[in-house]
């Protein structure tokens, strides 16, 4: 028997377990909370564990503001073999006896920091003629995705042996760890693939914010584990308005901002009333214009 849906809203940072897809994780939380709506702020591969921010209810309207934030990963690269998926889930497609030294590896890392061109893995969610590249690849089609610019702000070697190395990486949206591992190995004259991957931070959330699925399932008061909708907007200017102005915004109307310090122009901001998010929008000519309105 289907559960009755309820108007629950907020953010939860799930510590996604190994083997679960991001879509499955969203479905699980939506069921646990009987939420009307749910969505995640950035796909995490089934192979990966770690931070997967999930929005419930009205928080789904704030997903883009988390999705675009920076991310941090720890991963293990195994030397000597390439796979079809660039991780340990795929079949081996090439081998090499070459093993880089630690000195060679450290010398290669600077070329993979900053803004670089990266070719996404064939097994990815990128759309090709309306279909996911991964679906085409599984169907046996050759998928050649064009390189695209990505930004890697930090790439640190944590441990090195002849057979595998551990790294920590900070990057921006659109960066594929699997592609980095593939390209780094090829630059060192060998082959490689990712055998372990963990997202440790995303858009200001850290591992201290993460909640295990087992903890969530066992909780008798799950709502207290939710973070406010405004959590996703904490990096944007907040405009505190009164009830009358909030009512105008909820009907989709702009409001004139009053007061000596009222802003004239802001690209992205959010309006609140009594601590609750009313709308997300921008300020032009001293008027706040809503682009997304949230239910009370």
What residues fall within each predicted segment?
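Extended alpha-helical targeting/anchoring segments
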Residues: 124, 128-147, 152
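Accessory RNA 3′-end/elbow-binding domains used by RNA modification enzymes
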Residues: 1-40, 44, 48, 69, ...
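Glycine/acidic-rich beta-strand-loop module
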Residues: 37-67, 122, 135-138
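Residue-level signal for inorganic ion chemistry
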Residues: 54, 75, 130, 180, ...
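Acidic, low-complexity central loop/insert segments
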Residues: 59, 64-118
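Pseudouridine synthase
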Residues: 125, 132, 137, 164-204
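Helix-hairpin-helix/helix-loop-helix acidic hairpins
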Residues: 149-163
């Amino acid at each position: 028997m289907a559960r009755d849906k309820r108007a629950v809203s907020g953010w939860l940072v799930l510590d996604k377990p190994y083997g679960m897809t991001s879509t499955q994780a969203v479905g699980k939380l939506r069921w646990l909370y009987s939420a009307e709506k749910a969505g995640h702020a950035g796909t995490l591969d089934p192979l990966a564990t770690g931070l997967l921010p999930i929005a419930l209810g009205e928080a789904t309207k704030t997903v883009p503001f988390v999705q675009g934030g920076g991310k941090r990963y720890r991963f293990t690269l195994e030397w000597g073999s390439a796979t079809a998926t660039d991780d340990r889930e795929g079949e081996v497609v090439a081998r090499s006896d070459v093993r880089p030294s630690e000195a060679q590896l450290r010398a290669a890392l600077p070329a993979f920091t900053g803004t670089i061109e990266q070719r996404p893995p064939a097994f990815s969610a990128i759309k090709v003629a309306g279909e996911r590249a991964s679906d085409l690849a599984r169907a046996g089609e050759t998928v050649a995705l064009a390189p695209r610019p990505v930004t890697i702000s930090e790439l640190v070697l944590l441990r090195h042996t002849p057979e595998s190395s551990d790294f920590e990486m900070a990057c921006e949206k659109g960066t594929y760890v699997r592609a980095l591992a593939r390209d780094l190995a090829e630059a060192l004259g060998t082959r490689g693939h990712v055998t372990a991957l963990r997202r440790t931070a995303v858009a200001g959330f850290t591992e201290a914010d993460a909640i295990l699925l087992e903890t969530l399932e066992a909780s008798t008061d799950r709502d207290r584990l939710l973070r406010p909708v405004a959590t996703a907007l904490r990096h944007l200017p907040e405009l505190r308005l009164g009830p009358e102005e909030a009512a105008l915004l909820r009907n989709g109307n702009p409001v004139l901002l009053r007061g000596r310090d009222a802003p004239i122009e802001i690209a992205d901001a959010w309006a609140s009333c009594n601590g609750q998010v009313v709308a997300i929008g921008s300020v032009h000519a001293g008027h706040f214009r809503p682009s997304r309105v949230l239910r009370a």
